[in-house]
Amino acid sequence: NKEDVDKSYIKVGVGGEKRSHVVSEEDRKITAYHESGHAILFHLLPYVGPVHIVSIIPTGTGAGGYTMPLPQGDQEYITKAHLLNEIKVSMGGRIAEKIIFGNFTTGASQDIKMASGYARSMVTKYGMSENLGFINYESDDQEEVFLGKNLGHTKPYSEKIAAAIDEEVKQIVDECYR
């Protein structure tokens, strides 16, 4: 049934809900506005919505809540506009906190990681950089996952290119935040 499918979707997507976790009223309020920020942008921006589930119940992965879009099926190709809107949605929680409370919390740390990852992939993997062009700056072994993977590892590009990549990633994230 739909309820079982939703529970499975939540467990896979956010590690399940941690209902035993005691949350203060203040933290619950912050989480509610934070998740509302994501939900509003999912609703307003093309390619990324619509919203399927919004929850302020803490997750097994440590998040205070979550906002999940309705699954759009298997997508073979994702456009630059879609990735930019994913970055914007990931910033929605922090923006909502700033608007409502005049400040923001550490609650957006995973959102920041996601936004940075999307922007870096756009520049280094997908050739979507205006300044660095249609070039892949990732080496095949960058996808290896093991402790110490960077020991003795050299990048397949110069320090000048590394600085340009960092600058381009920052520029994409900054433009999406505005």
Language-model regions, residue ranges each:
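C-terminal helical "lid" subdomain and adjoining coupling/linker elements of P-loop NTPases
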Residues: 1-4, 11-30, 126-134
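Soluble catalytic regions of large protease machineries
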Residues: 29-33, 39-178
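AAA+ P-loop ATPase catalytic core
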Residues: 1-12, 94, 112-116
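Intrinsically disordered, low-complexity segments enriched in polar/charged residues with Gly/Pro
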Residues: 8, 17-18, 43, 101
